[in-house]
Amino acid sequence: MTPKQSPNSETGAVTEPPLVLVTGPSGAGRTTAINVLEDLDFEAIDNLPLRLVPALVAAGGADRALVLGLDPRNRDFSTEAMVDMIDMLKARRGLKTTVLYLDADAEILLRRFSETRRRHPLSPAESPELGVSRELDLMQPVKERSDVVIDTSDLNVHQLRAEVERLFAPSGRRLAVSLHSFSYKRGIPRNVDMVFDCRFLSNPYWEPALRVHDGRDQEVQDYVMSDARFQGFFDRVLDLTLSLLPAYREEGKSHFSIAFGCTGGQHRSVTLAETLAKALAREGQQVSIRHRELPGQQLK
């Protein structure tokens, strides 16, 4: 997740329900994000032609927040028209407009299309690679105008739901913390604030009885925690986390993410994420966990 500056250019008081525009390339999770916002009591309208948006907003009279799904596949879509519309809405006094852009790497979008066996809407008679490339180029100026960009390349539907809820759920919730485990072989996860390398700890992978298990299992956790270096490392991580959370909360941050990495992303990093989650929960902290290398679901 990449938040940018305040979504509205004007400084007047907000007098209308918030407006969220959700867009992004096909296959990046736009529909999922809209569904989450609808569950949060937003009035949702998907695939609205661009020419109808200004009139809808000008009509006013809404009694709850509105989310509009803007699809680059629409017949009247043009990058210039959408950028102009975004600028117009952000300049409207009394209206808080937020542009949420769902993004993903080209190879991930291609994989999602191949898994669903769908043709790409911008190249129905040509290769999907060409369609993905065209759409990413087409949407780049819109991405640059967006207030929040969520890269869903490494997210499944549940993790995207959690991200959207943290951003748009009603105010008053606690600062949400998400903990991640990962394998360095696949690179550091996107959208994380702090990363810890756990590869110095004893590796359960080399124990045949533990290799088939993961860090959610007690026997693996016991093995990792038996390393004399574990407790000192964990205590420092916990102290650092607990000292940072109030500062981030005061700054208005709604979400803080911490990632633990090891060689395979199955044992040590999972153990650290699970152990920290339990410790933070005992402090009354809202926590979610994501183990990237363990099985998950794909976005649609």
UniProtKB/Swiss-Prot annotation:
ATP binds at G24, P25, S26, G27, A28, G29, R30, T31. It holds the Pfam family RapZ-like_N. It comes from Ruegeria sp. (strain TM1040). Belongs to the RapZ-like family. Displays ATPase and GTPase activities. GTP binds at D71, P72, R73, N74. This is Nucleotide-binding protein TM1040_2438. Signal peptide: none annotated. The keyword Repeat does not apply. SUPFAM superfamilies: P-loop containing nucleoside triphosphate hydrolases.
